[in-house]
Every structure is written in structure tokens, then in C-alpha cells.
């Protein structure tokens, strides 16, 4: 196999963990068609029943949104609901032009996303309750590559080199690389889950000074996830994060972005949020504030945090010292949070709870989930335990030896 074939095989066998007689749904840009064929071939090689590809085109999507009338058709929702009920798994290949929707009203984009999400509850439930696997992976396109490497003579080739490197695809067995990567998360996840943390305090020189309470019965996870049927899969390739959910009403203080946010084809730069009792009460940005407004206006839950994620500064992705303008990659270069929905697996018993029960346990619910990066080289994160003890989880942007050597006995 060449490296691209190895990457496709990794996505199918480890990312999605495709099973015999399973339907695979792929969403991708038309520019990715050659790589999509490699993925489809790998799917059929492991016994997939069918591979259904849904292509999109940045230029056409832009034209449709500019009319202001772009809303989902019933058949779009029916497709996802029907395939979900038939046990399908879902692959999203990202790599669109980061500037594709520049100048398009953000409300048009968020209205479409919100409407489609509301029409696809059966599909969403299969993913949220870990009954169907899903994976997001990146594939270089020309516009994206030129954005990342504007001075390169061959930006697509350079971006492919970076994507394969951060995805741990090399001359070795890529699947074995990911099995080893999975094991690297386990010790820290175990410590976090047994520390009995009450809150964590984030501080850095940008101005971040934020206290985040964790809900009773919080669960940290990292690497991949177990489906309800026991199968293990990796939702993100690459991934470097250990994540959980904050208590919805337990976030107070100011939080500054460390990297630009690429969202729906628009860029937001140098932004911050102020939280009181969990809710965003003030915010601003040097560029793209209207995009933040469209996110926060999605629904009531969009004004609260749903994810807290730990990524050490100096991770393999951050070591490249490159802004990729793609959240999948950039979020794994930096500690981050997400506005909107929390993950059901991030609280004990969450996979058996209704939305109302999750809310009662402090888990935010929303139609949206938008990650943004906050990690810096001077970030500190101090945990306060329920017994009053304090321990620095992060100093200077990285896990501390105090945390890594913490005894749970």
C-alpha cells in the first residue's frame, strides 16, 4: 500500500471500524473524489454492504446560500434517518476552502444547519447514544492547501505530507500506530476520572481567567469511544485530546481564543467570551464577530459550553507551528472548549439518559457544537478537588509532573 491507501484503510478499519454487511455513508467535496474511491475500495474489502457518497461543491454551495433560500429538503433528512435506522456508519471528509463562505450571511448557514439537525433526530440519536460510529478526517484540496501554505510551489503535496504525518500514517503499520496511540491516553484519563474534581481554573497572559465546575459524575474520555455493542472506533483522525463536559451553569470568568476559528467558510480572529453562571454575557472579536453572533443565536444552549478538552502545547500537531484553518486539526494542537451540545458519554449513565435527564445533571443541550482553541504556551489549569486539595493539571501549557505522578491510592 502507498501512504494514501494506508490512510484510507486506517479510516475504514480504525476510524469507522466498518463491519461486514454495514452501509457506509461518506460526505466529501467533489475535489476529493480520487481519495473517496480509495476509501470505498477499503470499505468493500472489509465486507461493507454498500457505500453511499454525498458530494458537495464549495462554489455551488456558496451560490445557493447567497440566495438566502437554502433550507434542507425532506429527502435530505430522510436519507440520514433511514440509513441510521439500518445501522449505517458515517464518514465526513473535511478540507473545504476556509474562505468559501466569506461575505455570505452567517444566519443563512446557521439556519440551514439548525433546520437539518432538527429534522434528523433519529440519526442524531444513533450518534449521540453511541449506537453508530462516525469519523471525521481531512483530505487536502487546492483552496485549503493554498490558504495553509500560501508561498509553497506545491501546496497540495505539502498539505498531504502534513495530514499523513499528524494522522500517524508512515512506513509502519498505521493501525498499530493508532493502537499504541490509544494506550497513551489511558493513564491520564484514569487519573482525571478518579480525582473527584470540583472545578478547574484556567489562566494565561492573553487574559483568560476562567473557573469551570464539573458536573457530579463527570467522565473524561480520550482517543476513541466504545459503541453500545462493544466495538471501538476513533471519531477523529487525528486526535490528541482528552475531553469531558462542564457543568452547564458552572462557568464564570473570561476566556480568550488562542487561534482563529474557521467556521462555515468564515474566519473569526482574536475573540473572547465572558461567562456568568455558565452563560455568555459578553463577547467580541477583531474580525468575524457576526459569525459568533450567528453561533450564539442558534438556540439557548449555544450560549453555554458543552465541552472541555485538554491538549498539551507541543503536541505533534502544535509542534508543526502551522495554522491549518480546519477545526479538526487545529483543535488537536491546543486546549479547547466548545459552545453548544455536550457529549452523552461525558457523564456516568449518560448513554441511558433522555435530553431532560442530561440537562438535570448539568449537561448542556443544543443543536450546535462549535470548538474553539484556547491553549497557549503559558496556560495553567489548576484543579480543585472536592476534598479541598488543589493540583495543577497544566503549567506552561503542558501536563505537570505533579499530575502525571499523582497517586490514586
What are these regions (language model features)?
Residues 282-351:
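Dual-mode signal for accessory low-complexity, basic/Gly-rich regions
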Residues 103, 147-149, 267, 295, ...:
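Short conserved micro-motifs at the rims of enzyme active sites and ligand-binding pockets
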Residues 9, 193-195, 264-266, 301, ...:
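Short solvent-exposed loop/turn micro-motifs enriched in small/polar/acidic residues
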Residues 1-252, 389, 401-409:
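Active-site bordering "gate/hinge" segments
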Residues 356-409:
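Extended hydrophobic packing segments that form well-structured cores
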Residues 250-252, 268-270, 277-280, 303-307, ...:
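Active-site lining segments that contact anionic ligands and/or coordinate catalytic metals
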Residues 31, 96-98, 141, 207, ...:
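Short, glycine-/Ser/Thr-/acidic-enriched flexible segments
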Residues 244-300:
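Long, well-ordered mid-to-C-terminal structural blocks that present hydrophobic/aromatic surfaces
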Amino acid at each position: 500500500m502507498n501512504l494514501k491507501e494506508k490512510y484510507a484503510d486506517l479510516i475504514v478499519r480504525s476510524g469507522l471500524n466498518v463491519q461486514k454487511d454495514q452501509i457506509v455513508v461518506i460526505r466529501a467535496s467533489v475535489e476529493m473524489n480520487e481519495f473517496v474511491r480509495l476509501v470505498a475500495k477499503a470499505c468493500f474489502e472489509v465486507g461493507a454492504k454498500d457505500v453511499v457518497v454525498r458530494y458537495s461543491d464549495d462554489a455551488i454551495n456558496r451560490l445557493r446560500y447567497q440566495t438566502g433560500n437554502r433550507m434542507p429538503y425532506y429527502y435530505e433528512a430522510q436519507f440520514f434517518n433511514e440509513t441510521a435506522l439500518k445501522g449505517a456508519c458515517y464518514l465526513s471528509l473535511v478540507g473545504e476552502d476556509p474562505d468559501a463562505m466569506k461575505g455570505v450571511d452567517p444566519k443563512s448557514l446557521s439556519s440551514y444547519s439548525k433546520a437539518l439537525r432538527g429534522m434528523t433526530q433519529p440519526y442524531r440519536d444513533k450518534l449521540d447514544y453511541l449506537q453508530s460510529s462516525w469519523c471525521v478526517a481531512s483530505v487536502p484540496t487546492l483552496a485549503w492547501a493554498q490558504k495553509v501554505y500560501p508561498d509553497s510551489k506545491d501546496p497540495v503535496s505539502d498539505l498531504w505530507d502534513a495530514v499523513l504525518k499528524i494522522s500517524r500514517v508512515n512506513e509502519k503499520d498505521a493501525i498499530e500506530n493508532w493502537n499504541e496511540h490509544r494506550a497513551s491516553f489511558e493513564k491520564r484519563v484514569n487519573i482525571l476520572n478518579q480525582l473527584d474534581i470540583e472545578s478547574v481554573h484556567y489562566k494565561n497572559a492573553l487574559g483568560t481567567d476562567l473557573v469551570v465546575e464539573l458536573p457530579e459524575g463527570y467522565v473524561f474520555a480520550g482517543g476513541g469511544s466504545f459503541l453500545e455493542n462493544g466495538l471501538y472506533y476513533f471519531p477523529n483522525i487525528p486526535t490528541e485530546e482528552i475531553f469531558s463536559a462542564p457543568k452547564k451553569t458552572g462557568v464564570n470568568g473570561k476566556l480568550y481564543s488562542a487561534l482563529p476559528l474557521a467556521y462555515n467558510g468564515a474566519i473569526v480572529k482574536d475573540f473572547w467570551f465572558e461567562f456568568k453562571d455558565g452563560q455568555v454575557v459578553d463577547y467580541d472579536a477583531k474580525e468575524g464577530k457576526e459569525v459568533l453572533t450567528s453561533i450564539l443565536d442558534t438556540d439557548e444552549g449555544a450560549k453555554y459550553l458543552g465541552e472541555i478538552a485538554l491538549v498539551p502545547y507541543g503536541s505533534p500537531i502544535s509542534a508543526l507551528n502551522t495554522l491549518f484553518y480546519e477545526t479538526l486539526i487545529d483543535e488537536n494542537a491546543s486546549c479547547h472548549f466548545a459552545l453548544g451540545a455536550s457529549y452523552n458519554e461525558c457523564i456516568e449513565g449518560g448513554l441511558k439518559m433522555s435530553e431532560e435527564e442530561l440537562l438535570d445533571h448539568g449537561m448542556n443541550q443544543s443543536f450546535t457544537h462549535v470548538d474553539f482553541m484556547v491553549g497557549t504556551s503559558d496556560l495553567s489549569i489548576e484543579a480543585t478537588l472536592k476534598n479541598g486539595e488543589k493540583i495543577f493539571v497544566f503549567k506552561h501549557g503542558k501536563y505537570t509532573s505533579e499530575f502525571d505522578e499523582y497517586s490514586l491510592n
